[in-house]
Amino acid sequence: MTTSTASADKALNQAQRPVVQALMAALPKGTVILGGAVTERSAGIWRSDQIQAQVLVRPKTTEEVSCALRICHEHHQSVVPHGGLTGLVEGALTQPLDIVLSTERLNVIEEISASERTMVVQAGVMLQSVQEAAASEGLMFPLDLGSRGSCTLGGNLSTNAGGNRVIRYGMARDMVLGLEAVMADGTVISSMNRMIKNNAGYDLKHWFLGTEGTLGIITRAVLRCREEVTTAPTALVAINSFDALVAFLKQLDRGLAGNLSAFEVMWQNFYQLVTQPPAPNQRPLQDDAAYYVLVEAMGAAQEQLEAILEQALEAELIVDAVVSQSSQQTDQLWGLRDDVAQTFQFSPVFLFDVSLRLSEMARYVDAVNAGLAARFDAPKNFVLGHVGDGNLHFAIAVGGDSRAQREGVEAAVYEPLKAIQGSVSAEHGVGLEKKPYLHFVRDEAEIQLMRTIKAAMDPRGILNPGKIF
């Protein structure tokens, strides 16, 4: 034991000493880190605080994950899994007596099969690295998020991430053929299926997809890729009414014959925010329209998209449009949609991720804004989202972040959502932040079944305790 490790060991809570000693004895040197080397780490890339846990385990193999969890299970020790820490719902927050299990060293892309269009990837690999590796073999991994350069595959799968192309390719779970996960007692479930069709018994991967590390820790996955797309015409479109927006979406769906891969909508105030100083972005269209839609059509010809836009202009569904003429222009258009960080100039900002039926969307946004105006002076609500799949994001600033202000903002967002049977979490998960509102979406029988499953798979409740319900 080094001097620094010995010093950190002295600072450990007495109750943790036996489990830490067991972990350090069983795992390779450098796998377990203690004290300041842990607490100096950020609790999340969107947060200003640090990890509260004093102990962090960094396994390099599934066997090491299994060993660590077996020891923690024997000692009734709580474990919080960490990936890229890009989550927005406090799903990876720790308490002082927790142990963090980081997937940062599970970072190998093990195999790519161009003929079978599959990849075998460890949980700590960044999403962007997965995308780039697929492209190097003439493939595409369709999952895409603004945090692609920071988020990890394990986190994407454990939260069932959505992103920009759900309208065509589905959620993260739709891109997984098989996976490997370690249960609370160290049991390894190696369900590394490589077939698209496999109805032999329960599809066990779904116990770990979207369950936020509460039932097991994902270590590896078999991903389903697609053939690389050589064309992806992209346009930014200005629209003045939500009814016209819905009609335009239908026209695109019909005209592109299944090639519509993104339909991202920015409300006027968000578009103005990201195209005016201090934002560095250029303004491709005037900012006086009600909505701005980023359209992407993977696999379509540019002429096909341009013809649909001309028809929409003639039908007065849209008022203006610009079609990208280069990859640089495409990146600039996507840069507008991804520049959510501009909202932080009004910090503190409350971020929301909701889903609802398209037919309710315009009225719902009006109801949220009315609720905010009734509760606060001069609130700001920047609205954008994956409208093509019914997902909205809000960035709301009310001049503070006291408990009363947070509760007021949440009431303005969630109460009208409950009335129309929407979801408080479209793609970010539940974590701690949305836990009080789970009953808005799930009835008591559903929540009780979740508890029953949790008790069966993690009887000592050590995995990511307190999250979801």
Roles of regions detected by a PLM:
Residues 29, 419-430, 459-463:
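Alpha-helix capping/hinge segments and adjacent helical runs
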Residues 34-42, 223, 238, 244-412, ...:
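C-terminal substrate-recognition/cap domain of FAD-linked oxidoreductases
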Residues 108-264, 463:
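FAD-binding subdomain of flavoenzyme oxidoreductases
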Residues 187, 435-469:
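Activity-critical C-terminal alpha-helical subdomain
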